[in-house]
Each structure stands twice: as structure tokens, then as C-alpha cells.
Amino acid sequence: MLEAALTAGLCSVGADVESLGVLPTPAVAYLVGKYNADAGIVISASHNPMEFNGIKIFAGTGYKLPDEVENQIEAYIDNDCAGIELKTGAEVGRVYRRDDGLQDYVDHLYESIHGDLTGLRVCIDCANGASAAVAQKLFPRLGAKCTFIGIEPDGQNINKGVGSTHLENLEKAVVEGGFDCGIAFDGDADRCLGCDEKGQEMDGDKIIALLAMTMKEKGRLDGDTAVVTVMSNLGFIKYMESQGINTEKTAVGDRYVLENMRENGFAIGGEQSGHVILLHHATTGDGELTAGKLLKLLAESGKKMSELNGIYAQYPQVLVNVTANAAQKKAYKEDEVLAGFIENEQQKLMGMGRVLVRVSGTEPKIRVMVEGQDLDAIHRCADRIVDKINKRILGQ
């Protein structure tokens, strides 16, 4: 339904549409340039359930649209598209179906990864999403012996108990099956997380650290810098410093990471949640590219994944999501008393931790994150903040 409505709208203003079927978000970012399109559009719920479906738009360069252009599009929609001329007759756009997108994207990934994974046994969770067809072609072609889960999409089960937001099934499968490691994507495959052979999680921080170290050793870490967000673990930051790698920190959101990378000429960046951007090969976060590079690193290292996963100790971190609608999120942003309370909680940690409270841009939630060396202390801190939010914003 969404594809049909979107296609009809585009054709009604004279645009021709090439429909590529079900493909990962980063595939569209790549193919928009390869096919010389003016823009690329993805219908996706990202890592969320299917009822959160929306659209992501890429410019002809393969990069996401800047905020000001997205705001202009939203303004047109809010104004019932006033001033936009609707075409008639022969001027109406046409729709074309293309079946070569999948293979073109797989070929691009294969050439970008450029590795031999022979001898690796890997369990891969495709989240019942767009990565399923790609992963089943790509990783065996690279030489890995793979078992796949989450490869039975029915249009409704995407991200449901599987994928990067539900690692428990993958971790169990890896341990029970004796795999060398596990890889998990989200529904539209712009995120990648993993686990080692012991079933221990590998988040985006760990993956970025490992890939950045490898790039530095090969002289490919531009500016000796990785770009991350304020959510990155303090253990990660301190480890990178110890290895002579700078970290640039941005607001949460892969678009802000990418903006910093492009402005300053950096080659790697990403988020703890699994968005990893490798700018030498891609214009956006690409889960399958990230997985391929990580598996190549593992194969060439001669080590177990648990050894790689243990390169640094993470600081304990507590994350609590408070359900809040748009009005409640707005009220939180404007509450100066609450802001002062949160600042006071930060001071109580006395430099041994940090507090980050933010409004989610993709879900109806206020996220409370507290990090520090004392697990009991950060739990108490998070509880106090959540209780204050509930009382002042939610009236509970």
C-alpha cells in the first residue's frame, strides 16, 4: 500500500519511478548513484516493528537529504502540496520494475570487502528483513560457512523477536552450534551487531574500535580519528585514546556522525547501536558491509572472536526508556526544573560517570542513560531520574 501510494504520488508530478523490490536501505544509497537516479526512497521501519514504517530519502549523491530539505518536504505535505503542479496525459511519470538491483549490490559488497572468509562458521540473523536475500548470496560467496536465522519475512514479522534488537536468540544459537561468531542486522540492514563464540555481545563501539585499529595499522584511518556519538561508552573512549586514535563526538543519530565525517574528512564513524559508516566504500551505515569487514578482520587475525571482543572493558551502563508522546517529549525539553535535577544527578557521580537524557527521534520514548564504574550507584541515579520524569511529565 505504501509503495503504491508513494509511486502514484511521484508519477503524478511527472517523475519516473524504478521499483527495485525489497532491498536494504544502504543498497538504495549505493544504487541511486550507480543508476544515475535523481533520488532514492526507501520504505522502512528501520529497527522497529512494521507499524512504524516511514520513508527515508537519499539525494542523487547517495547521501541522506539535509535537514532543511527534509523540512521543506514536510512543509509541502502539511500544506497539502499547494503550489505543486500535477501532470496529466503523456506527462505523467512511468513505473519500471528492475530485477538487477540485488545482484549489483551484492557485487559491490563483495568487491568492497575483498576478503576470504574460508574456514569461518558464522550464524547470521537477518531480522526477517531486507538483508535476507543479500546475506545468503554474499557471505557464502566470500567463503564463510553460514547458518541463517530470521530469513522468513512475511511482511509483519520484521524485527519481531529477531535481529539486532533481540540478540538473545543469536547468542544462544552461536553457543549451542559451536559457531565462531554471530552477526545480526536490523530490518533494513543499516545496522550490524554481533556476538563472539561465547555468546557475548559485540556492540557498535567494539566493532568501530576493531575496524579503526585495523585501518590505522594499514594507514587508512584518515586523521587518525573515529566519529561517534555521545552514547559511546567511556571505556571505548579511553581505549581509543590509549591507541592514539582521536574520537569526535556528535549528537545521537547517524546523520550527525556522517555530517562530521564529511566536513572533516574522516573515514569511519558510527553509533553504539550498530550504525557503522565506512566512507571509503559507502555513503551511509551499511550492516552487511560492516559485517564483512569484521569477519575479514577475524579471519586474518588468527584469533577467536572473544579475544577481539575483549580489547577493552566497558563501563557499566544503564539505559531506561520512558514512554512519552509528542506533547510529553516537548514538555520534557522545556522543563527547566527537570533539567536542573538531571544536572544535579550528574554532579553526584563526581566525575566517575555521566548522565545522558534525550528524546528519541524515531520512537515515542525519552531515553535515560547513566554510565559509571559503580553499577549500584548508576542504577539508583537512573531510578531517581525516571521517577522525576514520571512525576513531572507523565503525572504518575
Which functions belong to the PLM regions below?
Residues 51-75, 195-211, 281-298:
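A short, gly/pro- and small-residue-rich
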Residues 1-13, 19, 38-39, 92-122, ...:
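An N-terminal, well-structured beta->alpha segment
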Residues 53-177:
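Gly/Ser/Thr-enriched, mixed-charge loops and adjacent short helices
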Residues 11, 20, 27, 71-106, ...:
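Proline/glycine-rich low-complexity loops and linkers
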Residues 128, 187, 359-363:
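A generic beta-sheet turn/junction motif
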Residues 28, 41, 47, 109, ...:
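Buried hydrophobic positions in well-ordered alpha/beta secondary-structure cores of metabolic enzymes
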Residues 52, 181, 218-396:
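Phosphate-binding and adjacent anionic-ligand microenvironments
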Residues 1-52, 137-195:
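N-terminal small/polar loop signature for handling phosphorylated ligands or for N-terminal nucleophile
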